[in-house]
């Protein structure tokens, strides 16, 4: 049962700015039914994910990367509800939306359906996206904003005394720990005294492989090439089974799809040696659609490392480079959130945790492993023994739940 956790933290600091107004009628979440807007959003969100990924690689070259694009998108879209004028426009355009083609109400309705679809109960798949908004007691949020974040983003809103920094920090950390079932502890360690609003977005995902690995076939101490001069030893899971896979000769990479038991899949992308940057630069929603069209099922002699990684990012600088500038400036316009005093974003933190194994963190009762063919010489060998990309997708919405690069699987 691979287990994933993601958390987006948006911290807004108090500052003075003249109030303004913004309008837009928002509907409430009625059902998880998908629509044309949702499918349109999947491509837009995917391109945002890869654009963000490329910015992260510049900031953290040659390191493990792991984050939840859909969590970040939802957190920023939710923030845009309280933004107005160019502050709102920059947030939405950085996400890939053109307000001329897609009105604000349609964008928010799309996220409404996305969150409803992701949170809709599914057998054998635990998937929950959640939000929490901690607002300073001295702040008077607009009723419309509170209604919208509750109806659209299923957000809990808490009135918090930020004048007591340690107590506010404990309140937020305790909430996050409860919601992630103890997987994220002590998230905030240095809450700033001028903080007045904290927005938390998290995504919890737990699923069982459709075809679990046999632990007895895991090879301890297998070599994994980190770079030309560095090799580490990792447990390497092994299985001979039928998988959807392909060799993309244009991008010089091998793609393998591993299905979960219900409504989710993992894409493992293995570039040829020296071709990682080329693959990273080409990733897009169009590439995903091409792979989805060309993947074919066949026998594979598969080797995948067993590992866990976690990553924490301050996305403020990256989002600035992606076009979100006013939100961090003194002229930020969040008059859609409150008429008291304006706000500006002081920090955007994101944390994601990842574990993958034969059965995961919990035992799977009565797992039966199918007999594998003795002769494997004719089956192609796909061995993830060097840096590779990893995508976790939800099938119904085609949303990228998680996106990452494994450079060193021994780094936790």
Curated annotation (Swiss-Prot):
Family: Belongs to the serpin family.
InterPro entries linked: Serpin_CS, Serpin_dom, Serpin_fam, Serpin_sf, Serpin_sf_1, Serpin_sf_2
Pfam families named in the record: Serpin
Protein's job: Major thyroid hormone transport protein in serum.
Organism: Ovis aries
Gene Ontology CC annotations of this record: extracellular space
Name of the molecule in the record: Thyroxine-binding globulin
Position of the signal peptide: 1-16
Subcellular location(s) of the protein: Secreted
Keyword Signal attached: yes
Tissue expression notes: Expressed by the liver and secreted in plasma.
Glycosylation sites: 35, 98, 164, 252
Annotated disulfide bonds: none
Record GO terms (molecular function): serine-type endopeptidase inhibitor activity
Chain sites annotated for binding thyroxine: 292, 395
Keywords: Glycoprotein, Secreted, Signal
SMART domains assigned to the protein according to its UniProt record, in alphabetical order: SERPIN
Gene: SERPINA7
């Amino acid at each position: 049962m691979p287990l994933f956790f993601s958390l987006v933290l948006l911290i807004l600091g108090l500052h003075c700015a003249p109030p303004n107004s913004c309008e837009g009628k928002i509907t409430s979440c009625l059902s998880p039914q998908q629509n044309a807007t949702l499918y349109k959003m999947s491509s837009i969100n995917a391109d945002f994910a890869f654009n963000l990924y490329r910015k992260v690689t510049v900031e953290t070259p040659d390191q493990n990367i792991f984050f939840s694009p859909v969590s970040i998108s939802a957190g920023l879209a939710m923030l845009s509800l309280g933004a107005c004028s160019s502050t709102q426009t920059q947030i939405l355009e950085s996400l890939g939306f053109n307000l001329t083609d897609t009105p604000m109400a349609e964008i928010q309705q799309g996220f409404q359906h996305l969150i409803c679809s992701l949170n809709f109960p599914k057998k054998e798949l635990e998937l929950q996206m959640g939000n929490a908004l901690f607002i300073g007691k001295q702040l008077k949020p607009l009723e419309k904003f509170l209604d919208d974040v509750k109806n659209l983003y299923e957000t809990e809103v808490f009135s918090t005394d930020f004048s007591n920094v340690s107590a506010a920090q404990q309140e937020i950390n305790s909430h996050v720990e409860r919601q992630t079932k103890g997987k994220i502890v002590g998230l905030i360690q240095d809450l700033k005294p001028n903080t007045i609003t904290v927005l938390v977005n998290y995504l919890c995902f737990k699923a069982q492989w459709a075809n679990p690995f046999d632990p007895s076939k895991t090879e301890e101490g297998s070599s994994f090439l980190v770079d030309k001069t560095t090799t580490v030893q990792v447990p390497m899971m092994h299985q001979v089974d039928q998988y959807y896979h392909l060799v993309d000769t244009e991008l010089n990479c091998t793609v393998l799809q591993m299905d979960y038991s219900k409504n989710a899949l993992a894409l493992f992308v293995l570039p040829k040696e020296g071709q990682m940057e080329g693959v990273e630069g080409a990733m897009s929603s169009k590439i995903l659609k091409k792979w989805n069209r060309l993947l074919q099922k066949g026998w594979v002699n598969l080797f995948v490392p067993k590992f866990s990684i976690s990553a924490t990012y301050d996305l403020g600088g990256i989002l600035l480079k992606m076009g979100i500038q006013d939100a961090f400036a003194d002229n930020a316009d969040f008059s859609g959130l409150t008429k008291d005093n304006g706000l500006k974003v002081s920090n955007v933190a994101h944390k994601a945790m990842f574990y993958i194994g034969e059965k995961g963190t919990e035992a799977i009762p009565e797992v039966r492993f199918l007999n594998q063919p003795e002769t494997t010489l004719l089956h192609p060998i796909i061995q993830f023994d060097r840096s590779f990309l990893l995508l976790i997708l939800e099938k119904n919405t085609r949303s990228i739940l998680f996106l990452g690069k494994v450079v060193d699987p021994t780094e936790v």
